[in-house]
Amino acid sequence: MNFLKGTLVIDHGKSAFLLTGARSSFPISLENPPDLNSEICLGIRPESVSFEPTGAVNPSSVVFEAGLEIVENLGHESLFHLDLFGQSVKARISSSKPMVASGPGVVRFAFRDMHWFDAKTEKRLSA
């Protein structure tokens, strides 16, 4: 699982996640959120991460610019090692999907695939 560090903030009057190194946040909904400005982690499985040369807006997912560092060809799939604002992200991509394996692109993950954790206690936060 990828664990991305960030901070719980308020944006336009709603709880939001500000990924460390990013300039903009995105809204999140937690049942019992920690205190404002608490460090939290976004957990996302490699198979739930996509990497594309460009990113269209989709209200059910979050898109960030990312750099491609390494591609491991594993036969039926490839493991993309990405740099997202200085944090390492892995994306498991099917080899049947045509991909450009170089240069910058966008990393995308759907809200439904996100898992939240308290950075200090490492306990899961209910969404």
Please annotate each region the language model reported.
Residues L84-F85:
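Short acidic, flexible loop segments centered on an aromatic residue
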Residues K5, L42, L74:
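Short glycine-rich loop/turn motifs that provide flexible caps or phosphate-binding loops at active sites
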Residues A91-S94:
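A conserved acidic, glycine/proline-rich C-terminal tail/linker
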Residues D11-I70, S88, P98-A127:
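Glycine/charge-rich catalytic "coupling/switch" loops of P-loop NTPases
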Residues M1-H12:
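ABC transporter nucleotide-binding domain
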